[in-house]
Amino acid sequence: MTRIHPTAIVEPGAQIDESVEIGPYAIVGPHVTIGARTTIGSHSVIEGHTTLGEDNRIGHYASVGGRPQDMKYKDEPTKLVIGNRNTIREFTTIHTGTVQDVGVTTLGDDNWIMAYVHIGHDCRVGNNVILSSNAQMAGHVEIGDFAIIGGMSGVHQFVRIGAHSMLGGASALVQDIPPFVIAAGNKAEPHGINVEGLRRRGFSADAISALRSAYRVLYKNGLSLEEAKVQLRELAEAGGDGDAPVTALVEFIDASQRGIIR
């Protein structure tokens, strides 16, 4: 049976699973769908065309599904889609998409979103991502699986953050971080491969060694980006555990529109 506090407001039209719990003074809008076993903290607002999957935990005073902070927005019925098993802590803001992009902001599964985080319109957050307190994502940011964003960091619009990468606290990021790379600073600069994170996630010693070699090619050998990509492609065909991650690195660089941190 759904447990809705008597002071909460659930507007007609909202689709709420019977196992959902909604705390005091929370507000759920008419176009919201909330999946099984999700809990909504007190004073939170879930609005817009927002879909929450199963087993999510929304902290107190969170604002989920609000209008995008984009002056071009004209009340189009854009969406926010959130997967399963996400923790979204107090005072976080997550906005719906815009028609200038694909119209949907997405958050995958098993993400840990700490207090006061902002996820702007049209962002695409993968799975198992950690966004530390006060990390701020502008619009259209893409974050790959298992990435970690340090607290008090700011990420420019349209920036891409690769899978298994890490951005240090209080950083300002204006270009893409390739997968597996650690970056920090204002403006953010590369500081090596995320070796400890890769070990924790089961990457082999050979794969990590190949990524370290790729990092040296990309950042330490004095090569232009085009020269480095030639050597990276050769490294990706070495015939070992490192082929797949190095290939992913090259493909990410090839797809970059803003350029990568250098």
UniProtKB/Swiss-Prot annotation:
Output the superkingdom of the source species: Bacteria
InterPro entries hit by this protein:
Acetyltransf_C, Acetyltransf_C_sf, Hexapep, Lipid_A_LpxA, Trimer_LpxA-like_sf
Q: Which GO terms describe its cellular component?
A: cytoplasm; membrane
Gene Ontology molecular functions: acyl-[acyl-carrier-protein]-UDP-N-acetylglucosamine O-acyltransferase activity
Keywords of this entry: Acyltransferase, Cytoplasm, Lipid A biosynthesis, Lipid biosynthesis, Lipid metabolism, Repeat, Transferase
Give the reactions, separated by semicolons, that this protein catalyses: a (3R)-hydroxyacyl-[ACP] + UDP-N-acetyl-alpha-D-glucosamine = a UDP-3-O-[(3R)-3-hydroxyacyl]-N-acetyl-alpha-D-glucosamine + holo-[ACP]
Q: Give the matching CDD domains.
A: LbH_UDP-GlcNAc_AT (cd03351)
Compartments, record wording: Cytoplasm
Pathway(s) it belongs to: Glycolipid biosynthesis; lipid IV(A) biosynthesis; lipid IV(A) from (3R)-3-hydroxytetradecanoyl-[acyl-carrier-protein] and UDP-N-acetyl-alpha-D-glucosamine: step 1/6
Q: Which EC number(s) are documented for this chain?
A: 2.3.1.129
In its UniProt record, which GO terms are filed under biological process?
lipid A biosynthetic process
Q: Which family does it belong to?
A: Belongs to the transferase hexapeptide repeat family. LpxA subfamily.
Please describe the quaternary structure of this protein. Homotrimer.
Its job: Involved in the biosynthesis of lipid A, a phosphorylated glycolipid that anchors the lipopolysaccharide to the outer membrane of the cell.
NCBIfam families the UniProt entry points to = lipid_A_lpxA, PRK05289.1
Q: What is this protein called?
A: Acyl-[acyl-carrier-protein]--UDP-N-acetylglucosamine O-acyltransferase
Query: What organism does this protein naturally occur in?
Result: Burkholderia cenocepacia (strain HI2424)
